[in-house]
């Protein structure tokens, strides 16, 4: 009898929760229509996986890619609409947030074809992989539009939990398990630090959680210049720093990059930085409006440390993925310059443009690592020697992406860095820009060192891995080459038409 009563209560409670969720989607669904498309795609993936056999695997890729493309289309149709606040102030939709959401969706769309061959060769579970990627994408999109402290905490946790599972996806690999453990422990610690910072912000503002209401609360309580705000700023900067992985919050990055499956690293290397950058700009600009000098100083220190340590340590690496890990630490230092400049002098427009180029440059490089690793089973930089003699397309596309990452003209990376540094120079960040220029020269050195290995034709330098190199007979090889071609084109051609891209970003933002 008691069991029946408890069961009936559970059914009633579940029905109420479902009806409330349905009511929210019915009245607020138009505000999060791109996110709803991904949710529908997730449900469809689960239904197909539970009712089908192995023959329907191509449908899983098709549904995932289609839901991402449809979500991008929905965002484009909603472009430049009036800003909207929904879900009782928890979520905000505007052009600034939608640009970052577009970048996250673009990353995920490119990562799925990049992963097809790797999944087939390693016999990874396909459905779960796609579910985690789409759910992480969903968490990143919600983080971009988060308008209160609770959503800013919950959305990245949704992203982070999927990231932990993806990084440890190859359970039999000891390095993958080690990377996941470090990632999980440091991620949990950073989340605790972030919540502690939020608690100081919540208390100082008189119990407000919405970003704009926090500013009003700080004015009413006269706490905007109090020590509590400084403490909140430090803790929140450390918490967000884990997601952005600037130095000295970068310790997890090389190990996770090296131990995780390569398609997962490609996905995490760009989406986490895009989502964290969107969140950082909103948090620093709105609640810490009165502490701009303090957070500018903090971010300048992080940018300098990231650019110097990231690029110098990258020179010493022998693993391609570890080298890209330290390179990404240096790259986030350049992005922080745009965050510091802000609205003035087109800082946000230049930051967004550079991140768009960084997505193509980075994913193109990882596509090459996936392709080469599947054929040779190695990640060592020395083992790439002479690749041009066996696979000219792979070697040339790798060289173009690496040169663009280094910032050599006339590639997209050069013009992206040029505009970013010029905005920083106009804003008076002379020392920061000078460090950026010097470290860019350092990065060109280790990128050119890899390109020299790729193009070498001397037999004594060619390793057995390249001598025995064979192109994959799998039909899915076309998918990774497609991703690589798109990334190479996006890393080269946009440099020629830089001004229109910047103009579109400026016009959209302001």
Curated annotation (Swiss-Prot):
Transmembrane segments: 24-44, 57-77, 99-119, 124-144, 149-169, 183-203, 227-247, 295-315, 323-343, 347-367, 395-415, 418-438, 484-504
Group of enzyme by EC: translocase
Membrane topology: Multi-pass membrane protein
The keyword NADP belongs to this UniProt entry's keyword annotation: yes
Catalytic activities: a plastoquinone + NADH + (n+1) H(+)(in) = a plastoquinol + NAD(+) + n H(+)(out); a plastoquinone + NADPH + (n+1) H(+)(in) = a plastoquinol + NADP(+) + n H(+)(out)
PANTHER family found in the cross-reference section: NADH DEHYDROGENASE
Name recorded for this polypeptide: NAD(P)H-quinone oxidoreductase subunit 2 A, chloroplastic
Organism for this UniProt entry: Platanus occidentalis
Lineage, top ranks: Eukaryota, Viridiplantae, Streptophyta, Embryophyta, Tracheophyta
């Amino acid at each position: 009898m008691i069991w029946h009563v408890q069961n009936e209560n559970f059914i009633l409670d579940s029905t109420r929760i479902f009806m409330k969720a349905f009511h929210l989607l019915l009245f607020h669904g138009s505000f999060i229509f791109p996110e709803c498309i991904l949710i529908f795609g997730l449900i469809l993936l689960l239904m197909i996986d539970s009712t089908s056999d192995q023959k329907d695997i191509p449908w899983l890729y098709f549904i995932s890619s289609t839901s991402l493309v449809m979500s991008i289309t929905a965002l484009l149709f909603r472009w430049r609409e009036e800003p909207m606040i929904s879900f009782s102030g928890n979520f905000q939709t505007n052009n600034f947030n939608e640009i970052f959401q577009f970048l996250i969706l673009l990353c995920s769309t490119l990562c799925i074809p990049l992963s097809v061959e790797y999944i087939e060769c390693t016999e990874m579970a396909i459905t779960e992989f796609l579910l985690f990627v789409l759910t992480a994408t969903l968490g990143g999109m919600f983080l971009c539009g988060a308008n209160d402290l609770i959503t800013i905490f919950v959305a990245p946790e949704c992203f982070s939990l999927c990231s932990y599972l993806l990084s440890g996806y190859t359970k039999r690999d000891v390095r993958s398990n080690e990377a996941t453990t470090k990632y999980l422990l440091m991620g949990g610690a950073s989340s605790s630090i972030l919540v502690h910072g939020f608690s100081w912000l919540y208390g100082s503002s008189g119990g407000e959680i919405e970003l704009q209401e926090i500013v009003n609360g700080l004015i009413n309580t006269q706490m905007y210049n109090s020590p509590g705000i400084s403490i909140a700023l430090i803790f929140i900067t450390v918490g967000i720093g884990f997601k952005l992985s600037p130095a000295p919050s970068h310790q997890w990055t090389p190990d996770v990059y090296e131990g995780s499956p390569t398609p997962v690293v490609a996905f995490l290397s760009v989406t986490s930085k895009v989502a964290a950058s969107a969140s950082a700009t909103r948090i620093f600009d709105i609640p810490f409006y009165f502490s701009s000098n303090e957070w500018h100083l903090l971010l300048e220190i992080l940018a300098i440390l990231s650019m110097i340590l990231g690029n110098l340590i990258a020179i010493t690496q022998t693993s391609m993925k570890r080298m890209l890990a330290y390179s990404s630490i240096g790259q986030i230092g350049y992005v922080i310059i745009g965050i510091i400049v802000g609205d003035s002098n087109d800082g946000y427009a230049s930051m967004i443009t550079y991140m768009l180029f960084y997505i193509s440059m980075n994913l193109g490089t990882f596509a090459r690592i996936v392709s080469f690793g599947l054929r040779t089973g190695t990640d060592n930089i020395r083992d790439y020697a002479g690749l041009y003699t066996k696979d000219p397309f792979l070697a040339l596309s790798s060289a173009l992406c690496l040169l663009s990452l280094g910032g050599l003209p006339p590639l997209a990376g050069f013009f992206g860095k040029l505009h970013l540094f010029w905005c920083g120079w106009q804003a008076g960040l002379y020392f920061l820009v000078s460090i950026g220029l010097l470290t860019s020269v350092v990065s060109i050195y280790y990128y050119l060192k890899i390109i020299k290995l790729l193009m070498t034709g001397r037999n004594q330098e060619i390793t057995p891995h390249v001598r025995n190199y064979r192109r994959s007979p799998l039909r899915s090889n076309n998918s990774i080459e497609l991703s690589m071609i798109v990334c190479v084109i996006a890393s080269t051609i946009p440099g020629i038409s830089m001004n229109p891209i910047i103009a579109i970003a400026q016009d959209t933002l302001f």
